[in-house]
Curated annotation (Swiss-Prot):
HAMAP family: Ribosomal_uL22_B. Pfam families: Ribosomal_L22 (PF00237). Keywords: Ribonucleoprotein, Ribosomal protein, RNA-binding, rRNA-binding. This is Large ribosomal subunit protein uL22. This protein binds specifically to 23S rRNA; its binding is stimulated by other ribosomal proteins, e.g. L4, L17, and L20. It is important during the early stages of 50S assembly. It makes multiple contacts with different domains of the 23S rRNA in the assembled 50S subunit and ribosome. GO terms for molecular function: rRNA binding; structural constituent of ribosome. Belongs to the universal ribosomal protein uL22 family. The lineage of its organism: Bacteria, Pseudomonadati, Bacteroidota, Cytophagia, Cytophagales. InterPro entries: Ribosomal_uL22, Ribosomal_uL22_bac/chlpt-type, Ribosomal_uL22_bac/org-type, Ribosomal_uL22_sf. One of its GO terms (biological process) is translation.
């Protein structure tokens, strides 16, 4: 008899974040966009369109998408490409064949507002937001960046080389001098 283990949402989220951090360490680039004022459900529809796509194709899809979240996601993809270029300065973006390796949308903070209702009541309006995390990577292996070796020189400091601090007058001497003058 096989038993299934139910994993909490918080544990799944922690695992997802750990996997994204691990991917970023290997050469992939991770970018965040926090507190986007769109509901999580609407943004996930747009994120599902570009998940696993090449970056050039994803940008084309997002550019002509009529949904509101597409503009924000397009800027995030462009920003992550710029981050990838900064991290891998020796490689060209066109030759790297970048793709969206991972993209997920988590719920952000919910602003609660009141809307007037009949008979003196008020309805609660929830203004939802979300957090987007995207990981882009290259399909091709990139050459390793050259490692610079820095030689360390041993510096011996002598006590005579250090200048000695001059002694400061005590604050009590100044106050005594002022009282004598008065």
């Amino acid at each position: 008899m096989e038993t299934t283990v139910k994993i909490k949402k918080s544990v799944l989220k922690r695992q997802k974040i750990a996997a994204a951090k691990e991917a970023a360490a290997k050469g992939a680039v991770k970018a965040h966009l926090n507190n986007v004022p769109t509901s999580t459900r609407k943004m996930r529809l747009v994120a599902d369109l570009v998940r696993g796509q090449r970056v050039t194709l994803a940008l084309g899809i997002l550019k002509y998408q009529a949904k509101q979240g597409a503009r924000k996601l397009e800027k995030l993809v462009l920003g992550s490409v710029a981050d990838w270029q900064a991290k891998n300065s020796e490689a060209r973006v066109e030759d790297a064949d970048l793709y969206i390796r991972e993209i997920f949308v988590d719920g952000g903070r919910v602003l609660k507002r009141l809307r007037t209702a009949p008979q003196g009541r008020a309805y609660r309006v929830r203004k939802r937001s979300n957090h987007i995390t995207i990981v882009i990577d290259s399909l091709k292996e990139l050459p390793a960046a050259p490692v610079a070796v820095v030689e360390e020189k041993e510096v011996v400091a002598t006590a005579a080389a250090k200048p000695k601090a001059t002694a400061k007058k005590a604050t009590g001497e100044k106050s005594k001098a002022k009282t004598k003058a008065n």
